[in-house]
Amino acid sequence: MRVFKVTACVPSQTRIRTQRELQNTYFTKLVPYDNWFREQQRIMKMGGKIVKVELATGKPGTNTGLL
Protein backbone atom coordinates (compact mmCIF):
# COMPACT_ATOMS: atom_id res chain seq x y z
CA MET A 1 0.00 0.00 0.00
CA ARG A 2 1.36 3.39 -0.98
CA VAL A 3 1.06 6.01 1.73
CA PHE A 4 2.55 9.41 2.41
CA LYS A 5 4.11 10.29 5.75
CA VAL A 6 2.91 13.87 6.21
CA THR A 7 4.24 16.29 8.81
CA ALA A 8 2.12 19.41 9.19
CA CYS A 9 1.66 22.37 11.48
CA VAL A 10 -1.82 23.72 12.22
CA PRO A 11 -2.98 26.48 14.59
CA SER A 12 -4.57 25.16 17.78
CA GLN A 13 -8.36 25.01 17.94
CA THR A 14 -8.66 26.72 21.33
CA ARG A 15 -8.56 30.48 21.55
CA ILE A 16 -6.40 31.85 24.31
CA ARG A 17 -6.78 35.26 25.98
CA THR A 18 -5.92 37.32 22.93
CA GLN A 19 -6.03 36.58 19.24
CA ARG A 20 -2.31 37.28 19.02
CA GLU A 21 -1.46 34.28 21.21
CA LEU A 22 -1.67 31.38 18.78
CA GLN A 23 -0.23 27.99 19.54
CA ASN A 24 0.68 25.68 16.70
CA THR A 25 0.27 21.93 16.75
CA TYR A 26 2.70 19.72 14.83
CA PHE A 27 1.62 16.24 13.84
CA THR A 28 2.82 13.40 11.65
CA LYS A 29 0.45 10.87 10.14
CA LEU A 30 0.29 8.31 7.37
CA VAL A 31 -2.11 9.28 4.57
CA PRO A 32 -3.13 6.83 1.83
CA TYR A 33 -2.05 7.80 -1.68
CA ASP A 34 -5.68 8.10 -2.84
CA ASN A 35 -6.69 10.44 0.02
CA TRP A 36 -3.68 12.75 -0.26
CA PHE A 37 -5.47 15.61 -2.03
CA ARG A 38 -8.36 15.61 0.48
CA GLU A 39 -5.92 15.65 3.42
CA GLN A 40 -3.93 18.48 1.84
CA GLN A 41 -7.12 20.53 1.40
CA ARG A 42 -8.12 19.86 5.03
CA ILE A 43 -4.78 21.08 6.38
CA MET A 44 -4.83 24.21 4.22
CA LYS A 45 -8.45 24.98 5.14
CA MET A 46 -7.51 24.86 8.84
CA GLY A 47 -4.86 27.50 8.14
CA GLY A 48 -2.03 25.02 8.49
CA LYS A 49 1.20 24.48 6.66
CA ILE A 50 2.62 21.22 5.35
CA VAL A 51 6.18 20.89 6.60
CA LYS A 52 7.35 17.62 5.06
CA VAL A 53 5.99 14.82 2.88
CA GLU A 54 7.68 11.44 2.42
CA LEU A 55 6.67 8.21 0.70
CA ALA A 56 6.18 5.47 3.28
CA THR A 57 4.52 2.12 3.84
CA GLY A 58 2.33 1.08 6.72
CA LYS A 59 -1.18 1.31 8.10
CA PRO A 60 -3.13 4.44 7.06
CA GLY A 61 -4.25 6.93 9.70
CA THR A 62 -1.82 5.79 12.38
CA ASN A 63 0.08 8.29 14.46
CA THR A 64 3.76 8.05 13.57
CA GLY A 65 5.09 10.04 16.51
CA LEU A 66 6.88 7.04 17.98
CA LEU A 67 8.60 5.81 14.81
UniProtKB/Swiss-Prot annotation:
Transmembrane segments: none annotated. The keyword Thylakoid applies. Disulfide bonds: none annotated. Its main location: membrane. Residues 1-56 form the CpcD-like domain. PROSITE patterns: CPCD_LIKE. Keywords: Antenna complex, Membrane, Photosynthesis, Phycobilisome, Thylakoid. It comes from the Bacteria. It is a peripheral membrane protein. GO terms for biological process: photosynthesis. Pfam families: CpcD. The keyword Membrane applies. SUPFAM superfamilies: Allophycocyanin linker chain (domain) (SSF54580). Coiled coil: none annotated. It is found in: Cellular thylakoid membrane. GO terms for cellular component: phycobilisome; plasma membrane-derived thylakoid membrane. Belongs to the phycobilisome linker protein family. This is Phycobilisome 7.8 kDa linker polypeptide, allophycocyanin-associated, core. It comes from Arthrospira platensis (Spirulina platensis).
